[in-house]
Regions:
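Extreme N-terminal segment that seeds HTH/winged-HTH DNA-binding domains in transcriptional regulators
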Residues: 1-35, 41
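Short secondary-structure boundary/capping segments
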Residues: 5, 65-66
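Short hinge/loop at the helix->beta-strand junction immediately C-terminal to the helix-turn-helix recognition helix
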Residues: 29-30, 59, 64-65
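A short alpha-helical element within helix-turn-helix/winged-helix DNA-binding domains
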Residues: 35-46, 60
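Short, Lys/Arg-rich nucleic-acid/phosphate-binding segment
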Residues: 36, 68-72
Length: 72
């Protein structure tokens, strides 16, 4: 999974993450049975706030692209 953040883009970072993950899910690049990285792990890798990552994940779930399974 590759996610690139463009700090010069006018789009908020959470939206960039959301859009890229959504595209990868739709195209099949990211298999539907594959777990996303943890919120903390992705935030650390991208050097962004956990809150920003959580917002992107929340948007994916709200639009039906992901489901949260607690405790995994």
């Amino acid at each position: 999974m590759n996610i690139f953040i463009d700090n010069k883009s006018g789009a908020p970072i959470y939206e960039q993450i959301f859009t890229q993950l959504k595209s990868q899910i739709i195209s099949g690049t990211l298999p539907s049975d594959e777990a996303l990285p943890s919120i903390r792990s992705l935030a650390k890798d991208l050097r962004i706030s956990v809150v920003t990552t959580k917002r992107a994940y929340d948007e994916l779930e709200k639009e039906g692209f992901t489901v949260t399974i607690h405790g995994k």
